[in-house]
Regions:
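Active-site mouth of glycoside hydrolases
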Residues: 33-35, 40-277, 289
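N-terminal low-complexity, Pro/Thr/Ser-rich intrinsically disordered segments
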Residues: 23-36
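Sec-dependent signal peptide recognition
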Residues: 2-11
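Aromatic- and carboxylate-lined catalytic core of secreted/periplasmic carbohydrate-active enzymes
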Residues: 312, 320-323, 328-444, 455-471
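Extracellular glycoside hydrolase catalytic/binding regions
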Residues: 202-205, 216-363
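Short strand-edge motifs at loop-to-beta-strand transitions and within beta-strands
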Residues: 450-452
Length: 471
């Protein structure tokens, strides 16, 4: 498996190849063939450095480049088989830097001058991720920075900068509503909407600073927003802007919509425009429970197949923690596995308190799912709950290449029948994985008939099993 090879590479190799944090585009680190892109043989997945890669992750923050101990955090993720992080370009937490320079005497920002600390942190983050072959999914704009309390500290607020006034910018000094109320003119600056060049020139300058650092790296995915409900013209503008700036370099873009319902018209603005968006992020489906959480992506998967434009489906944030509001810890753990068994290309635990982050529970699941997918060729498997009978509503989930190999996930023990007719007469190996302990049970061999009865070693707990035709 590609990940195992990467895991053994000395982390200093990439660092030794570059003498600066941000290589110029003329000396890009990787050729297009090595950049992250849909897998040529199965575009529902990603390929990186020319080979398929399954992206798994979790982290303590969403704007991960801002944290102090980032290197140790990435080392931990890498050590357990993780290779995927989220990177909102957000600044609203205590201790975060903003993307513009601030005058220490006046306390005002100059939107003509980049913020050195902010961009230094981002450059370092890019370098550290690349050295560990960790893919980062950037979100250019996080709407929660532009309303309520964070807006009071935001450099774009006219009261906080020396570049424009309230009247000149059309921006409000106070926005007390949830950003979903769309009170801010910030997200209407593009030509197709209000064509507000007073703001837009500085927005472009900020994205230029981001791109001159990020584009040379091959391991970056670009998402326009965090759970937006703004006009699709906003995301369209920035997707086209990134593509224009990238030139001949391959870039992968998407938009993340606010709607929890994947059938919402919002999501069609991504799904129906593959010329703009190379992948679909369905993170908001992680508000859904149990079998519903499984069923919704299957409808989207079929919609993508019917479109003739196969693309990866990503899940960059999985809600669910006992400390949060969007499902409990069990929900988060189950969703992590259902995503991958349901055919998604990525699965990542959201930061606390709404997700499990990279705590001990998340670590066990990342390690175990990586162990399991290293035992099968996940890139040739497809969701196959149709092969399960005598199955409870949320009892088991199956991905398979029928006649070759099968993998099942049990959220809380179980006893089901697996249709192995495609392998009838063949010898099968059966091996159980205790997910919480990240340990395998001894292999058991049997002969395939029409159905195989699979009973978890214990009546409760998170279990997975791999069934393979023996050579």
């Amino acid at each position: 498996m590609f990940y195992k090879i990467l895991h053994l590479l000395p982390l200093i190799l990439l660092v030794a190849c570059t003498t600066q944090l941000t290589p110029p585009m003329s000396k890009a680190i990787m050729t297009n063939a090595d950049r992250i892109q849909p897998y040529a043989q199965n575009p529902f997945y990603w390929q990186y450095k020319g080979v398929p890669v399954l992206l798994l992750g979790g982290s303590v923050e969403d704007n991960l480049f801002q944290i102090a101990d980032i290197e140790a955090h990435l080392d931990l993720l890498h050590s357990i088989g993780g290779n995927y992080v989220r990177c909102t370009m957000s600044s609203r937490d205590e201790g975060d830097a903003w993307p513009f320079a601030r005058d220490a005497n006046t306390g005002l920002y100059n939107l003509e001058a980049p913020g050195e600390e902010y961009w230094t942190r981002f450059e370092r983050f890019l370098k550290l991720c690349a050295a560990r072959d960790i893919v980062l999914q950037i979100e250019l704009w996080d709407r929660f920075d532009f309303a309520r309390e964070p807006w009071q500290d935001n450099p774009y607020n006219p009261k906080n900068n020396t570049n424009y006034s309230l009247e000149e910018s059309g921006l409000k000094e106070a926005i007390n509503s949830h950003p979903g109320a769309k009170e801010s003119a910030f997200f209407r600056s593009v030509p197709a909407l209000e064509n507000n060049e007073v703001i837009l020139r500085y927005q472009r300058a900020q994205i230029d600073e981001l791109l001159k650092r990020a584009l040379p790296y091959p391991n970056v995915l670009y998402c326009m927003d965090n759970e937006t409900n703004e006009s699709p013209e906003w995301g369209k503008y920035w997707a086209l802007y990134i593509k224009a700036k990238a030139g001949d370099a391959l870039v992968q873009t998407t938009e993340m919509w606010d709607a929890w319902d994947l059938q919402s018209a919002q999501h069609r603005h991504t799904l129906d425009h593959p010329e703009l968006y190379a992948f679909f992020d369905l993170s908001q489906n992680n508000h859904r429970p149990a079998n519903e959480h499984w069923a919704n992506p299957q409808l989207i998967r079929q919609y993508i197949i019917d479109s003739g434009q196969i693309r990866p489906m990503n899940s960059v944030k999985i809600y669910g923690a006992n400390t949060g509001r969007f499902g409990n810890g069990r929900d988060g753990q189950e969703r992590f596995w259902r995503n991958i068994f349901g055919g998604l290309a990525t699965s990542r635990f959201h930061r606390p308190d709404s997700g499990l982050g990279l705590g001990a529970i998340a670590q066990a699941h990342i390690r175990s799912l990586r162990d399991l997918t290293d035992q099968i060729d996940i890139f040739t498997c497809t969701p196959h709950n149709d092969l399960l009978t005598e199955r409870g509503w949320n009892e088991a989930y199956c991905t398979a290449n029928p006649g070759v190999e099968y993998a099942l996930f049990f959220p809380d023990g179980g006893n089901i029948l697996l249709d192995v007719e495609a392998a009838e007469g063949e010898k099968l190996s059966v091996r159980w994985l205790d997910i919480r302990q990240s340990t395998w049970q001894d292999e058991v061999n049997t002969t395939a008939e029409n159905q195989l009865n699979l009973v978890t070693p214990k009546e409760e707990g998170y279990w997975a099993v791999v069934v393979k035709v023996m050579e």
